[in-house]
Amino acid sequence: MKSISKVEEVLEPISKIAEKIGLDEDEIELYGKYKAKISLDILKKKAQLQEGKVILVTSINPTPFGEGKTTTAIGLSMAINRLGFKSIVTLREPSLGPFLGLKGGATGGGASQILPSIDINLHFTGDIHAVTSANNLLCAAVDNHIYHGNRLGINPKSITIKRAMDMNDRSLRHIIVGLSNDQKGAIREDGFVISVASEVMAVLCLSMSYDDLKEKLGNILVGFTYDKKPVYAKDLNVHGSMALLLKDALKPNLVQTSENTAAIVHGGPFANIAHGTNSIVATKIAQKLSEYVVVEAGFGSDLGAEKFINIVARKSGIYPQAAVLVVTVKALKHHAKIEENSGLQSGVNSIQQGLENLEKHIENLKVMGLETVVALNKFPDDKDEEIELIRSFCEEMGVEFSVSSAYTHGSEGVLELAEKVIRLSDKRKRINFVYQDSDFIEEKIKKVATIIYGAKDVKFSKAALSKLELIKNLKVEHFPICMSKTQYSLSDDPKLLGKPKDFILNVTDIEIKNGAGFIVVMCGDIIAMPGLGKDFAALHLDIDSSGNPIFK
């Protein structure tokens, strides 16, 4: 067993990190020695300052264990600082579900981490707990309203919100609630989503102030009356108390990297289910405090990056000046369906199909108007000829290429990437949205499916078609769409690797997130409450007699 906290011996007091980016002691709230909340007043105080440039970090379709996007983003920010510029990396807060489930932590690794990593991966400053509480307060209020006479006439079968928990637990996906001895409540089907996939999390990440937060929470659609009129959270009068529960959660969290540069970690929406980027208030604050903000969008360009452009940028005016597309030899071989231990002497002749996946992601970023650097996250067993093949391919595609060794060497291993990103950020073209606000929802879905995924067409289920009619009736067709699908493929089938052609995207359901202001489009077998695998990560975590975490 080994300690997973030794790297944290380099930690500096968070007040010193705050000082480096121009924050006074009265502008942060300490959560212990190494974590702090940033005051929302910063945006008013720094209003006259020029906004820093935004660098968007994305990837190709990943393997189940990720491709080092977070490690690369952290290393890139550290490298930009090392070159003499001021940079802050902004990231999502890790969810306990993946940390204790399959993927493990989401704080980078090796010489390129955010710290204190174990605190961040566990309860951190309690933001996700607050989101869970606010979400479940709303759910409790709905059932309580029905129990006490149902003045609004809510149809229990029409309730659209689900309870939330920050844990992978498949047994809670579909449940029955309302069983009671007094038989006054409504027995109905319900379920749980993981907290980071809840609409409350999306609302938190898209809100800029307490008034904005409360308004969005009040607009959450909770269900319909028996005569099919919509019911919102504000009709139950709990949106104020929900906002109160989120009072501190709205403030971004300040931590540090393994080289003692600033990192703002705030919000945690999943990218395959939700919109997949840290809060806009965190990025806005980082822009006022630095010259370059490195933002990570979850999973590949087909998910996190697409949603950053079409949801986050559209709503916030935060436009990236350049993009970094993270790739690994391992992932390319995966997309070429080459097993890691297949006995092949070289993968040079066998990753061409994998390069097709990279090609599509490069095309996607070009479509969205982003100048791009492909960053190869280097592993020790990567062969020089494999790296050169990828380099040559990128040159043919007309994009920059750089090898990243942030995990091993920290900022020193990403200096070339940082230099190329800085240079490219001065060349930014106009951002292109994939669809327009005025497009019909069906048209928006088809544009993303055909342009970004490469689908031939889209097939809508009966449930999805009925929701399209509901969207028209509620007059929310102007909302952007939040595509919800597998992260492992450009299609909705996780087994369809590489660059699939002539496939049909299956839209199974559509959800109206009226508070967040977008439409969730469920594709394939996507599930909002993950389950644990047989050998899940929590089986390898422990604590010693001194309270130090250990990894087995």
Swiss-Prot record:
The keyword Oxidoreductase appears for this protein: no
Broadest EC class assigned to this enzyme: ligase
Annotated GO biological process: tetrahydrofolate interconversion
Superkingdom of origin organism? Bacteria
Q: Does the keyword Transferase apply?
A: no
SUPFAM superfamilies in UniProt: P-loop containing nucleoside triphosphate hydrolases (SSF52540)
User: What Pfam families is this protein classified in?
Assistant: FTHFS
Citing just one GO molecular function, the answer is: ATP binding
Query: Which reactions is this enzyme annotated as catalysing?
Result: (6S)-5,6,7,8-tetrahydrofolate + formate + ATP = (6R)-10-formyltetrahydrofolate + ADP + phosphate
Residues holding ATP: 63-70
EC number(s) for this protein? 6.3.4.3
- Which pathway does the UniProt entry assign to this protein? One-carbon metabolism; tetrahydrofolate interconversion
Keywords per UniProt: ATP-binding, Ligase, Nucleotide-binding, One-carbon metabolism
Q: Where is the signal peptide?
A: none
Entry's InterPro entries? Formate_THF_ligase (IPR000559), P-loop_NTPase (IPR027417)
For this protein, the record's CDD domains field holds: FTHFS
Describe the family membership recorded for this protein in Swiss-Prot or TrEMBL. Answer: Belongs to the formate--tetrahydrofolate ligase family.
Q: This protein is called what?
A: Formate--tetrahydrofolate ligase
